[in-house]
Design a protein with these regions (language model features):
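Positively charged, amphipathic N-terminal segments that serve as targeting/anchoring signals
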Residues: 2-199, 203-209
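C-terminal substrate-binding/active-site "lid" region of AdoMet-derived donor-dependent transferases
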Residues: 211-215
Length: 215
């Protein structure tokens, strides 16, 4: 097993803050790693291991970032309503370009991940890669779903009547909600929503699964 080989793992020494004068290219993994100054990975194994770990945070970043491959173009790969949402979110994410936004940023941006499971088990330094791409912004990641909070010692999922909070640092924190989103939404636990400060991701929604057709 590679973990028992005794070799160093420099590919997991992730870069930290991004210099303001260095542009990130998110067209593909190779260009992203190069422009973010990741360790140069020589093997497919290294590349597969690192991309698997970074898949969730960088997928989110690739949608929100101003240099996203999903550009604000009516003929692009997102819907018109999606373009409106991205425009509002980027207005918040880039305050130096939008001087008036400071009066509205009274809380962190909330990223809701619905049906979270593997996403909620990633360590903080991995999710921190998302925040490094938006150095002016604080984030709250809200993991929502009955399998979002794992007791690693007992190897079982935990149910809690109140949100569990984990603070990574002053710029990013995790909030675990162990119920279904529609239950929490109907209870108005997340109100009020703000199109400039809230965004939702469903990585594994199962919308087309037969067992969900009744609901």
């Amino acid at each position: 097993h590679d973990l028992r080989s005794g070799r160093p793992f420099p590919e997991f020494d992730f870069p930290q803050g991004q210099d303001f004068d260095r542009t990130v290219n998110m067209t593909n993994w190779d260009l992203f790693f190069y422009t973010r100054q990741f360790y140069s990975m020589d093997t497919e194994f290294q590349l597969a291991a690192v991309t698997k770990m970074l898949s969730y945070p960088i997928s989110i970043a690739s949608v929100l970032h101003q240099f996203s491959p999903y550009s604000l173009n009516p003929k692009g790969p997102v819907t018109l309503e999606g373009l409106k949402s991205l425009a509002a979110l980027r207005y918040t994410l880039y305050p130096l370009e939008n001087k008036t936004i400071s009066s509205t940023k009274d809380r962190p941006m909330r990223i809701f991940i619905l049906g979270a499971r593997a996403e909620a088990q990633l360590p903080g330094h991995v999710w921190k890669q998302l925040q490094y791409l938006f150095p002016e912004q604080m984030f709250e990641l809200h993991f929502v779903g009955p399998e979002c909070l794992l007791n690693k010692e007992k190897h079982q999922y935990v149910t809690s009547s109140t949100p569990a909070v984990k603070r990574v640092d002053e710029t990013i924190s995790f909030v675990y909600h162990t119920d279904f989103f529609h239950v929490l939404h109907e209870a108005q636990d997340f109100f009020p929503y703000d199109p400039y400060l809230d965004v939702f991701f469903c990585f594994h929604p199962g919308f087309g699964a037969p067992e969900t057709s009744a609901s």
